[in-house]
């Protein structure tokens, strides 16, 4: 039986190995990022990301439609105005002239078609047409079913000094409908308060209209859901409920609304050889 020989091995110090005798190191995939090639790669990647981000945010933040903000704040149909109606913070206060004023003495008496010709009424300052025209072919943009102002079944005034463009349609405007209802209810209250209903508020037709307006305002109030906090009134050391004045609310810019309605507002003209929806004369409100 043979004898197993034992051999002792001694490690060679690294310093005694020649450079070409050392085992080659396996290249790492991260070696690409070292040296001038890695710098060039990272620089190119950074530039691509920057340019992509610039175009993305430029398209989404600075496009004409971006000024309308999120759909939570603006309806898609508002793009038909070609400019947004902004929101602004407003502290609401009592305007006693509207409390004391009577819409019967204003354009609201006949929805702008008549007035008593007396002293100016504060209600005249908030009267605007209930109807507007969109002349950028709203049906082609997904907002049709308005009153046609051109083509078959048109209700546009064919003798309007400003011809209607093809595809124009007329629509009511919610804010003016709601304001019309506020004035109608105020008229009915004043009629019963001062004349016992002799101005017509006690007719079945007018009572039905007032009921309709109350329902319109009920739903509009719930729709807008104003969550502004109202501070209570204080008398001495007691809190006595609240009247709602002096608190901040988030409101649409009324001046912007006025500009749009004056630009797009229309009136129904009948007589003098003309009939149909007609552009408002410039400067007329």
UniProtKB/Swiss-Prot annotation:
Chain span(s) of sequence motif HXXHC 1: 177-181
Compartmental location: Membrane
Motif (HXXHC 2): 209-213
Keyword tags: Glycoprotein, Membrane, Oxidoreductase, Transmembrane, Transmembrane helix, Virulence
Membrane topology: Single-pass membrane protein
Ranges where the record places region Disordered: 143-165
One CC-aspect GO term: membrane
Pfam families for the chain: UstYa
InterPro entries: UstYa-like
Recorded GO MF terms: oxidoreductase activity
Metabolic or biological pathway, per its Swiss-Prot or TrEMBL entry: Mycotoxin biosynthesis
Family classification: Belongs to the ustYa family.
Function description: UstYa family oxidase; part of the gene cluster that mediates the biosynthesis of the phomopsins, a group of hexapeptide mycotoxins which infects lupins and causes lupinosis disease in livestock. Within the pathway, phomYe catalyzes the desaturation of the Pro moiety into 3,4-dehydroproline (dPro). The pathway starts with the processing of the precursor phomA by several endopeptidases including kexin proteases as well as the cluster-specific S41 family peptidase phomP1 and the oligopeptidase phomG to produce 10 identical copies of the hexapeptide Tyr-Val-Ile-Pro-Ile-Asp.
Domain notes: The 2 HXXHC motifs are conserved in ustYa family proteins and might form active sites.
Protein name (database record): UstYa family oxidase phomYe
Species this chain originates from: Diaporthe leptostromiformis
Gene name of the encoded protein: phomYe
